[in-house]
Swiss-Prot record:
Keyword Acyltransferase carried by entry: yes
Known pathway: Phospholipid metabolism; CDP-diacylglycerol biosynthesis; CDP-diacylglycerol from sn-glycerol 3-phosphate: step 1/3
Signal peptide positions on this chain: none
Lineage summary: Bacteria, Pseudomonadati, Pseudomonadota, Gammaproteobacteria, Vibrionales
Main localization (coarse): membrane
Protein name: Glycerol-3-phosphate acyltransferase
């Protein structure tokens, strides 16, 4: 570097230290992007800019990356560690050709790779984004634009403290040299590819131009679909067309978002303060997959599970910090109250009524509005379950929004549409006490400002929060596979509902929910809750609880549930200490040590957190249950019984294992339990290990309540084979409530009618019911006997007593 540049950089550093505050995406690039610090690194920036270079230098040093201003040595000669892919404008120049010095460095590096087979330099494309404000409808400007001196100065004043250093995945120059050669044309190709990449990054970060709200309404009113329904409504109701048109405008005002970047930017500061006050940390996983989809131009639909009203804010906050545009969020009309409604609307919320069946005007306008969002390229978010889960378990999907998404594709969208399932987890859900009261029968309180203020008063440290992005689902690929002729149904005007629509949407919904559960985050509280709720009297010594946590951790680490599920990196001791600090347990001391327990009220609340991860332990718990209740059992017998029971667990808990991989997974879990010395193996025979029987019993108990529900329903079917769906659900629910009272079962979902509905549907699909809905006793009886063998004598006696009384 020349002396002049060195002096210039020194003079720039002081004002930049005051004017510029940058965040880096990703925040841990060495790990997230697999950057090898042992291999040489060269940075590629979009424009010749000393301000950008110095901003990169500051971030690189903070992140542990090489200083871009330190030279790189090639064959004994020192060269700059950076290249610019465009000259960028001078005061009166807009030339954007590849700078000669960058071209020369590319040629030198590529020749070095051609001459040295072991050389493998890493090229890291890096761009500095000065602000992320999207443009306005009707304006046109490039997504990434070079700035001359005066423009850069103005930008620094406006957006210097709203800048982002985007670090992209590494490009292997060894790969480029081996596959594309090392001549000058390749250097130009590298620069062109980098420019396209930088432009896509900017679009992914700021999003498409924001619409003029009034122009959007006028455009929707003129759409053929809405115009047609307005005329039909006016005719059927015998009213003036203008009156219906005015009504339509009112519906649009009620629905449409009024997105404000300034609110997002300023709200980010408030939310940062809020998260720091509420949580000890936010854990985000697999965000790079979503960034890649955004840069490839996908229409992204985020489909998170719904635990809390905080979900709305948390996901938008996380996406903003991951360099993505906060989505337009479908929110229930119940949240449109002052002052929250206007704030949510400016933060990207569009409001939807809970039900609009039979209201053609509303449904048409909403469908057209959603199609407009997709057509313009705005990312969208809606909650897969419709409402918040009161039990902590993933609910069955509400398919209305999903069906409208598919219908929007049938309007002729020219971009791929991809669902991104999102698992959101907390170590404390603010509404959990309210959920418990509602499950006991208290009427749900309508959302209002007073409720918000009461919640704010309770703000305290809630431990950790988790946002795990699941495996994306390409709707285009799914439709191609399950409805190969779907494109024949494309109609830009009339909403289509071809014969394949309902089964395909149901299939997508099930896959979506399964991918959400695949991305589950086990944490200190969910693991402690699982162990304590399995214990007699909901109490364990501190040592026993630590051992049980270690058992769970080994299972999750050694037999990973999925590629997107996450497991704490801490050991059992550290997790327990963290959980105790959350102040949710009763800690008692005696001469023998400490006892950790749950009081009756906390036992009910803790079921919520256990239910977040119960699916992770469904199979190992069932294996443990089979060993515990049979004392000695063969692997073949375990495989046979699990094959019978698994379809019910799969449907209820959204488990992802297919039938052809189930045996292998079961064997892996058996091997793990043997490795932990929880069971003993002699050839093909398994038996209890008395030394660790307590840990095996605790593991086995996790699935007990689920099996008890199955036993209740199957016992009813055996006694009354012709029992209809509604009767089976009602009678099973009554018996479950009785069991709950008599045996101290605190889990609110134990007698949830919806769970029995899922069970009935699975009985039908698995052939336990005939076409008329009557029980096929030749199949029901063996399953019922197998499950009954896994119940305690007390539970079996109660079920028998209730059935006798009913008879």
């Amino acid at each position: 570097m020349s002396t002049g540049h060195t002096i210039y950089h020194s003079l720039l550093k002081l004002p930049l230290s005051v004017m510029v505050k940058s965040s880096s995406i990703p925040s841990n690039p060495i790990e997230d992007l697999n950057i090898d610090l042992e291999r040489p690194i060269i940075y590629a920036l979009p424009f010749r800019s000393h301000v950008d270079l110095l901003t990169l230098q500051k971030s690189a040093l903070e992140l542990g990356l090489p200083d871009p201003l330190s030279p790189i040595e090639i064959e004994g000669v020192k060269y700059p560690r950076y290249v610019f892919t465009s000259i960028g404008p001078k005061m009166f120049d807009t030339d954007d050709d590849l700078p000669q010095e960058s071209l020369d460095l590319f040629k030198i590096v590529l020749k070095h790779h051609a001459d040295n087979p072991d050389a493998d330099f890493q090229l890291i494309p890096t761009s500095i984004l000065w602000g992320r404000k999207p443009g306005k409808e009707g304006t046109s400007k490039p997504h990434l634009m070079p700035l001359n001196g005066p423009q850069k100065f103005v930008t620094l004043i406006k957006a210097g403290r709203d800048s982002t250093v985007r670090i992209s995945p590494v490009v292997s120059l060894r790969y480029m040299a081996d596959n594309h050669g090392s001549d000058e044309a390749i250097a130009h190709k590298l620069a062109r590819v980098a420019k396209i990449h930088f432009s896509r990054q900017k679009l992914a970060a700021s999003g498409p131009n924001l619409p003029n709200r009034q122009a959007l309404f006028n455009r929707l009113l003129k759409s053929q679909a809405i115009e047609k329904v307005i005329l039909e409504e006016a005719k059927s109701r015998n009213v003036d067309v203008e009156k219906v048109r005015k009504e339509a405008m009112g519906i649009m005002e009620e629905i449409a978002t009024n997105f404000s970047y300034s609110l997002i930017k300023n709200g980010n500061r408030i939310l940062k303060w809020l998260w720091n006050r509420l949580y000890q940390g936010l854990n985000i996983n697999n965000a790079s997959t979503v960034r890649k989809l955004a840069q490839e131009g996908h229409e992204i639909v985020y489909v998170p599970c719904h635990r809390s009203h905080m979900d709305y804010l948390l996901l938008s906050y996380v996406l903003y910090h991951e360099g993505l545009v906060p989505p337009h969020i479908a929110a229930g009309i119940n949240l449109n109250f002052f002052p929250a409604g206007p704030i949510f609307r400016r933060g990207g919320a569009f409001f939807i009524r809970r039900s609009f069946k039979g209201n053609r005007l509303y449904s048409t306008i909403f469908r057209e509005y959603l199609a407009e969002l997709f057509a313009k390229g705005y990312s969208v978010e809606y909650f897969s379950e419709g409402g918040r889960s009161r039990t902590g378990r993933l609910l069955q999907a509400k398919t209305g929004m999903l069906a409208m998404t598919v219908q929007a594709m049938l309007r002729g969208l020219n971009r791929p549409v991809t669902l991104v399932p999102v698992y959101i987890g907390y170590e404390h859900v603010m509404e959990v006490t309210t959920y418990a009261k509602e499950l006991r029968g208290k009427r749900k309180e309508k959302e209002n400002a007073g409720q918000v203020l009461r919640t704010l008063r309770k703000l305290r440290n809630f431990g950790q929060g988790y946002v795990n992005f699941g495996e994306p689902i390409s709707l285009n690929h799914y439709l191609n596979e399950h409805a190969p002729n779907w494109s024949e149904s494309i109609n830009p005007i009339e909403p289509q509902k071809p014969e394949w629509m309902t089964p395909v949407v149901n299939g997508i919904a099930n896959k979506m929910m399964t991918h959400i559960n695949d991305a589950a985050a086990a944490n200190a509280l969910t693991l402690c809750a699982t162990a304590l709720l399995a214990a007699n009297q909901r109490a364990l010594s501190k040592e026993d609880l630590t051992e049980q946590l270690d058992c769970y951790l080994q299972i999750l680490r050694n037999v990973p549930y999925s590629a997107t599920a996450t497991v704490p990196s801490e050991d059992a001791d550290a997790l327990l200490e963290h959980a105790i600090k959350l102040d949710k347990f009763v800690i008692e001391k005696d001469t023998l040590g400490e006892i950790v327990s749950l009081d009756r009220n906390q036992s009910l609340l803790m079921t919520y957190y256990r239910n977040n991860i119960i699916h992770l332990f469904a199979l190992p718990s069932l294996i443990a249950k089979l060993v515990v209740h049979h004392d000695t059992i063969t692997v073949e017998q375990i495989q046979e019984q699990i094959k019978l029971i698994y379809p019910f667990l799969k449907a209820e808990l959204f488990l992802h294992y297919e039938e052809d991989e189930l045996a292998s997974i079961v064997n892996n879990h058996i091997d793990e339990l043997v490795q932990q010395n929880l069971i003993l193996r002699d050839g093909d025979t398994l038996q209890l290990c008395n030394a660790n029987i307590r840990k095996l019993h605790l593991l086995a108990h996790t699935i007990s309540e689920t099996l008890q529900r199955y036993a209740i329903a199957l016992t009813h079917l055996q006694a009354s084979p012709d029992l209809g769906k509604d009767e089976l659900e009602e009678q099973s629910q009554i018996m479950a409530q009785r069991l709950s009272r008599l045996h101290g079962i605190n889990a609110p979902e134990f007698f949830d009618k919806g769970v029995f509905c899922i069970l009935f549907n699975t009985l039908k699909t698995e052939g336990y019911l005939d076409e008329d809905g009557a029980a096929v006793l030749s199949k029901v009886e063996p399953l019922s006997q197998d499950i009954a063998h896994l119940l305690t004598p007390e539970i079996k006696l109660t079920i028998h007593a209730v059935m006798t009384k009913e008879d």
